[in-house]
């Protein structure tokens, strides 16, 4: 008999998924591709139970990282103690973690019902771990839309979209209403499924340089790009780059396409 679920900790952004259809869609992702599985923030093991069954049936190494010390007794219903690491996921150097667990040479699938209050910094960490080849992540809908705009036909470029899609191909797996959780959040959610590009648009070694450039580019979304960039780059270089791309200096960052953002980065970094 399973243990009764504890109360969710609001300060940690906890909302326990209870919709069996959504659980099944998440836990069935990347079949035949994943060679090892990491779950971040498993909580009382709602996804863990099914991920553990799948990992066992497919012979996949499976580990979880959890911060809340109330949850090991729940997790031990489904996995062993040596599969559980109790720490703050934001503080984990993922590549070192994978090496320690002897899965650094495998195609790793990362799964998480992300704590909504730290979903963006966690995602930024995940992007930088080359061992992670696949991700299935639950976001607050507003954040998911910034990673992969699925609720509008209009292109709204932003720094989170640009940095994520530089390294991963993204698509919507499913939308998730508040009633799918206990307690229900005040917002809608969405699950994105993400596959690492075989060749990233920008080398991972330049991640921080790209991140810095994107922060500048999107620092004042309503301001014209020519005005934003001239404080950091020579005007002749800006003008020649914009001419080459066929875009006006008066364009705003949110109107750019991803390929234009990347080309602008490449040209201006010279």
Protein language model features and the residues they cover:
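C-terminal lobe and adjacent flexible extensions of AdoMet/dcAdoMet transferase-like proteins
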Residues: 216-270
């Amino acid at each position: 008999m399973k243990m009764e679920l504890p109360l969710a900790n609001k300060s940690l952004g906890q909302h326990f998924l209870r919709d069996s259809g959504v659980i099944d869609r998440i836990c069935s992702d990347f079949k035949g591709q994943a060679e090892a599985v990491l779950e971040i923030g498993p909580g009382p093991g709602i996804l863990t139970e099914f991920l553990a069954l799948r990992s066992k049936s497919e012979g996949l190494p499976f580990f979880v990282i959890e911060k809340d010390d109330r949850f090991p007794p729940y997790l031990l219903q489904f996995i062993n103690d040596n599969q559980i690491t109790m720490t703050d996921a934001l503080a984990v150097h993922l590549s070192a973690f994978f090496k320690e667990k002897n899965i650094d040479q495998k195609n790793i699938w990362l799964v998480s019902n992300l704590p909504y209050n730290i979903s963006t910094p966690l995602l930024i960490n995940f992007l930088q771990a080359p061992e992670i080849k696949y991700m299935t992540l639950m976001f607050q809908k507003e954040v998911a839309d910034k990673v992969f705009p699925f609720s509008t036909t209009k292109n709204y470029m932003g720094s989170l979209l640009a940095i994520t899609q530089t390294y991963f191909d993204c698509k919507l797996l499913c939308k998730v209403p508040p009633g799918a959780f206990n307690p229900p959040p005040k917002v809608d959610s969405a699950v994105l499924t993400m596959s690492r590009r075989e060749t990233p648009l920008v080398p991972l070694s330049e991640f921080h340089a790209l991140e810095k450039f994107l922060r500048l580019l999107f620092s004042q979304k309503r301001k014209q790009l020519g005005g934003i960039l001239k404080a950091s780059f020579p005007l002749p270089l800006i003008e020649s780059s914009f001419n080459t791309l066929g875009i006006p200096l008066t364009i705003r960052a949110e109107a750019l396409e991803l390929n234009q953002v990347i080309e602008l980065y490449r040209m201006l970094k010279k």
